[in-house]
Amino acid sequence: MDNGASSYRRFLDGDESAFESIMKELFRGLVFFIDGFVHDTHAAEDIAIDTFSDLVVHRHRYNFKVSLKTYLYMVGRSRALDYIKHRKVIDFVELSEAHAVADEAAALEEMVLADDRKRQVNSAIAKLPEDMRVVVHLIYFEEMTYEEAAKVMKKNRKQVDNLLYRAKKELRIILGKDGELLL
């Protein structure tokens, strides 16, 4: 799943229905995400609409290096924080609570980015040959030693070492230059 990137490419090529598809797929989730910052559903909807408008007006800003969903959530977060900063209504929230909200926002952004990275890595792992998939799973997900993985796979330690080396190399190729950061 590309989280809207292919639809956005179709939109850039002139397919207006592709943008509607993006809106249907991502709008509600973006509103919910923004509402977590502003605690006002109507304002969150307005900010989400502005975020999608920004995508149309400033087409060159999205560079396909992250998923479209991640990009929209980053822009939405930024707009939500701007809204909070410039809101004319003075909240009776304590300053310490405001810092906690900002810390939660940063943590939430990290979670969204981490989820996107996990999906990319899991998708790349699924493309590996079976032996490589198994060794990656045993070593990194099951946290087995090379010796334990070798026993499970009925291979010797050197074979496991070689398989893991080739698997990492293949993952870097599949993930592209961003793979260096993910692995």
Positions of predicted regions on the chain:
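Arg/Lys-rich amphipathic alpha helix in sigma70-family domain 2
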Residues: V57-F64, M74-V93, A114
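Conserved RNAP core-binding helix
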Residues: K24, V31, T41-H58
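Internal acidic/polar
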Residues: I90-A114
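Short helix-capping/turn signature of helix-turn-helix
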Residues: E25-R28, G36-H39, H137-M144
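Sigma70-family region 2
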Residues: L12-D13, D50-S67
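Residue-level preference for hydrophobic side chains embedded in well-ordered alpha helices
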Residues: I22, L26, L30, T51, ...
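DNA-recognition helix of helix-turn-helix
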Residues: Q120, A124, M132, F141, ...
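N-terminal module of bacterial RNA polymerase sigma factors
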Residues: M1-G29, G36, I173, L183
